Amino acid sequence: MSARAGIIVTGTEVLTGRVQDRNGPWIADRLLELGVELAHITICGDRPADIEAQLRFLAAEGVDLIVTSGGLGPTADDLTVATVARFCGRELILDTELEQRIADILRRLMGRRTDVDFDALRAANRKQAMVPDGATVLEPVGTAPGVVVPGSPTVLVLPGPPRELQPMWRTAVQTEALRSAIAGRTEYRQDMVRMFGLPESGLAETLRDAERDLAGFDRLEITTCLRRGELEIVTRYEPDAEPVYRNLLTLLRDRHGSAIFSEDGSLVDDQVAALLAGHTIATAESCTGGMLSARLTERAGSSAYVAGAAVCYADAAKVELLGVPADLIADHGAVSEPVAEAMADGALRRFGADVAVAITGIAGPGGGTELKPVGTVCFCVRRADGRVVTRTVRLPGDRSDVRERSTTVAMHLLRRALQDG
């Protein structure tokens, strides 16, 4: 049986939704990489009683390792270390060497500021140097150190800011206390297949057939997720079950080969970036308001291939900035394939790009008609050599869903156009 772990994300700001939890999913992925089975992720506020209740719950579940995030700062509500010490039956002691290292960090952070009472600041941060007796101290990335408290279960206490937590994790997994806690781990492999254009019901039917027909199917742990209009199929298995996974992959290829765009977990964004090497792209957007160009420029190095973008929401902007004929809009409507094609052609010329993508649609909640209901979106991908692809789709969901899914459709149309050479 594999080692099991639980995660406690602390912080009232996370519990109430003011701050999105980024640590829980990140730690979950790292545990998976280590071959540790994740039993629970819990979120609680800053009250010590609530934190201790979560610790006791996970201990009762029989986990070997508990990972906490948050509550390591110098303020009054940062009480995770003290709570963990009490839970583990350990006395808090002042680590004078750690206190000095924290003071050195504070001195560097303050620099030449003369308006700060350094002694008062140091005193306020002294609580960060109080650690459970017998714990392994993890060097601070900011000012807050982490600790590993050995026991049954072992508790790893990490800071809340991801920029501090993630580097500290790499140190934590090298400690003897943590490695001992997960010594019974089972090595797993994980593979991800991504699909686009296949409804969840179609995949569900295939997986039901696989469960019935594939020998050893029960050795695969499969999770599916619909994200940005794409299907993600994540399969986790022990190494000797690889032939079973290969048989599943063959079945997926046979039934849904045209929908599969990634078998190695790569995103369509990664693929488009690679395909644009040596080329330049321009975008012309209406209903998405620049979301496609934002997505294209999320990746470092995108300046090598993104030539420019035009957001033309009003019809007049389409005419003035992209040269879309006014009579074309009058004859076909702003949401039409002819107008999308003219927008792409205008972007291609204005920015001197090799390829252009245009989006025009009705995101809602108003503006729809019987012929063009809310969710109707028209796309065009035009190449400088004259090749062109146009498409009209009707996307489900609210305004936000339609806009986000529109960018995904555009990325896949672009991917296919670039793959065709």
From Swiss-Prot:
Pfam families reported for this sequence: CinA, MoCF_biosynth
InterPro entries in alphabetical order: CinA, CinA-like_C, CinA_C, Competence-induced_CinA, MoaB/Mog-like_dom_sf, MoaB/Mog_dom
User: What HAMAP family does UniProt report for this protein, alphabetically?
Assistant: CinA_B
Family label? Belongs to the CinA family.
Protein name according to UniProt: CinA-like protein
The species is Mycobacterium sp. (strain JLS)
